[in-house]
């Protein structure tokens, strides 16, 4: 893919860059057609620190909080992370395979990391998200849809049901769909019926 004013080798020019070592090449025939939305905060429910960035760059002090012992040794990443105030950071080039989906399947295809771009929102899956996060998310998703052949946007809960619950009931799917102007077919069945916020 050629570079554009907004994209340089899969790096989005409106995101702060903090490179993660946790990535690999996508399979040669993979088509980047899925956006997966997640939420995360470390420790859970606490916002504003740098623990998520440290996790994604393998620099988290496992002894800094009791919760961290339960995730000790994890090597994970996401392409993007949106803070509560809307700040956007990128950890992995979208042309590469980030490690965000885990064991997953969506619409007949397994291993969603192969064809997905992962976006983490700072938050927990039983609360709502900040308006500034939605503003950043809409802008980012619009740019991704223009750049890559995206046909699907789903939550971690949809690609790993029973194992994951994020971004959760507090995420406003109708808001995202309306702001992007995409058809219902882009989204998981049922999420656009009503806002659960």
Describe every region a protein language model picked out:
Residues 88, 116-121:
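Internal catalytic-core helix/loop-beta-alpha segment
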Residues 39-40, 121, 157:
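Residues immediately flanking
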Residues 1-110:
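N-terminal catalytic cores of peptidoglycan-degrading enzymes
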Residues 2-13, 110-116, 124-197:
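Basic/polar, cationic surfaces and motifs that engage anionic cell-wall
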Residues 83-84, 104, 121, 163, ...:
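Short, functionally important structural connectors and interaction interfaces within domains
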């Amino acid at each position: 893919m050629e570079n554009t004013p907004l994209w340089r080798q899969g790096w989005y020019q409106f995101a702060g860059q903090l490179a993660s070592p946790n990535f690999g090449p996508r399979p040669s025939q993979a088509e980047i057609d899925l956006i997966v939305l997640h939420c995360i905060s470390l420790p859970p429910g606490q916002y504003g620190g740098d623990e998520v960035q440290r996790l994604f760059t393998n620099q988290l002090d496992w002894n800094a909080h009791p919760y961290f012992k339960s995730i000790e040794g994890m090597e994970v990443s996401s392409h993007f992370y949106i803070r509560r105030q809307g700040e956007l950071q990128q950890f992995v080039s979208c042309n590469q395979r980030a490690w965000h989906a885990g064991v997953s399947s969506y619409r007949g295809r397994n291993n969603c990391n192969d064809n997905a771009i992962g976006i983490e929102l700072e938050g927990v899956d039983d609360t709502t998200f900040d308006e500034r996060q939605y503003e950043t998310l809409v802008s980012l998703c619009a740019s991704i849809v223009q750049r890559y052949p995206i046909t699907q946007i789903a939550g971690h809960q949809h690609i790993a049901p029973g194992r994951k619950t994020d971004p959760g009931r507090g995420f406003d799917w109708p808001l995202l769909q309306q702001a992007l102007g995409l058809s219902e077919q882009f989204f998981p069945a049922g999420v656009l019926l009503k806002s659960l916020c």
